[in-house]
C-alpha cells in the first residue's frame, strides 16, 4: 500500500509540473517569435535550480520530509523538466538544416541546467 501512496504522491507532483511546463511553453512561444525552443530551455534551467535547491536543503537539514521531497523532485520537477522534448527539438532543428541552432540548443540546455543545479545548491546553503 505504501508504494501506491508514493506513486500517487509522484503522480500529483508530475501533474502540476507538466501543467506548468505546458503553460510556460505556450506563453514563451507567444513572447518570442522564431524556431528556437525557449520554453524547453526555461523549464530545464528553472527545474535544475529548484531541484538543486531542494536536494541541498534535504541533504543538510530535516526541513523537507521524504514524501515532500518525492513530490517536489521526482514528481513536480520530473514533470516540469523534459529531456525527451529537448532531445527531439534539438534533432528536429538539425534535421531541418538549422545545425548551429540545434547545437546551440543542446549546449545551452546542458550547460545552463548544470549551472542551475549549482545555483540551486548555493541558494540552499545560503537559506539554510
From Swiss-Prot:
Question: What keywords are assigned to this protein?
Answer: Cell membrane, Ion channel, Ion transport, Membrane, Metal-binding, Sodium, Transmembrane, Transmembrane helix, Transport
Question: What sections of the protein cross the membrane?
Answer: 4-24, 37-57, 63-83, 99-119
Subcellular localization is given as:
Cell membrane
- Look up and give the membrane topology term: Multi-pass membrane protein
Q: How is its activity regulated?
A: Na(+) is not transported, but it plays an essential structural role and its presence is essential for fluoride channel function.
Q: Which residues bind Na(+)?
A: 78, 81
Query: Catalytic activity annotated for this protein?
Result: fluoride(in) = fluoride(out)
Put simply, this protein is called Fluoride-specific ion channel FluC
Gene name on record?
Answer: fluC
